[in-house]
Structures are given as structure tokens and as C-alpha cells.
């Protein structure tokens, strides 16, 4: 029997900052030359202009496919066909967890790279190597696991702050819970979804997330509420 190993997986590149969506094109260029942008109409109405301008400034073509709301097997297959017909070499999800999960699954099936630009805090989807697939009626169907994480995750903190405050609160709760999960996994020396025992790096990041949120989350939520 092979000896147990420790492993950690993460996105190829993580970018975060106020106004960083204006640099999306710049960060996409090393990933692919023909991106397909996937966003629903609501999200595109909020950030589409900035995304288009960013890609044009970087000399990249602007091709957009509308996400239809549910990351179902049917929607994933439709996006695969859209990727193939557009000749894209990187699929870019812009939006929440449902959009991101659908694009990751489609990018994997189309055998191209994928990138994520989340617009809310309330999801683990942006950095993970899996997708949650639902039925057309919105009921859970399956998890799909991938051999790699997104090549790029770009988070515009101002866009996230502009989203409904309940989504920020949900994201804070989810991130706090990550430390409890990571601590339990480390103490029990159990395998993680990365395919091995937990690393000191992964466990330390979960603890750091807890510490940062414990010290700052309430003030951050209050600040977002004050801008409403």
C-alpha cells in the first residue's frame, strides 16, 4: 500500500482588489486569446460595460453567451456547444456560483481553460475544482470533480460590496465555517477533497481567514449597509 501523501490545490492565479474588473483583459491574455464570456443578463447589465472595455483595451475579442440560470447537465452541454462554435480557448464565468459551476463543467468537457470573475461573496465555486449540477427543476443531481482548478480567479471587491448585503453575510458565514472544517480534518488526519491529507498551508489559510473575518467582518458588513 502506498504511503499517504499531503496535497493542496488552488487556482493558477488569484487577483483581488477594488476596480480589478478593469484589468480582467490584462490577466486573461496569458490564459487565452479567444475568451467566451458567460453571464446572465442581470450581471451583464451591472458589469458588462467594464468587462467589454477591459478586454478591448487588452486586444482581446468580446464574445458573450447568456447563462440561463440553472447549472444543469442540459445547460452545461449547451455551453459546450457555444464554446466549440465560437472557437474559444478559455471560458470566463462572470456572476455567482451557478454561473461559475456551469462554466467550469463546460470548460472541462470542451477541453479548454476556464477563469472566474465572481460578483458575490456567497459561494465557494470560484476557486474550487468541482461543480454542483442540478436538475432542470433546481434539485441537486451530482457533483462533478475536475483534475485542476480555474486558471484565473479575479475578484473586484467593489463589485462584491455592491451586491445585496445578505450575500456578503452568507459568504462570511461560509468562510468562518471553513476553519472549523479544516481544523477537524487536520485533527483527524483525514483525506481532503484535494485527494490527500491536509497540508500546513491549507490549514493555515483557513485559520487566517477565520482571524481576518473575526476582526473585520462586522465592520465590513456595517460599512456595506451604510452605503445602501
For each feature predicted by the language model, list its residue ranges.
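Active-site segments that bind and position negatively charged phosphate/pyrophosphate groups
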Residues: 192-228
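Short, conserved catalytic/metal-binding motifs centered on acidic residues
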Residues: 17, 97, 176
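A glycine/threonine-rich phosphate-anchoring loop and its flanking beta-alpha core
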Residues: 12, 108-205
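Short glycine/serine/threonine-rich phosphate/pyrophosphate-binding segments
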Residues: 21, 44-48, 98-105, 123-127
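A short, small-residue-rich loop immediately preceding and capping a beta-strand
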Residues: 83-120
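ATP/NTP phosphate-donor binding region
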Residues: 1-90
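Predominant activation on well-ordered alpha-helical scaffold segments within soluble catalytic domains
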Residues: 25, 52, 77-80, 173-184, ...
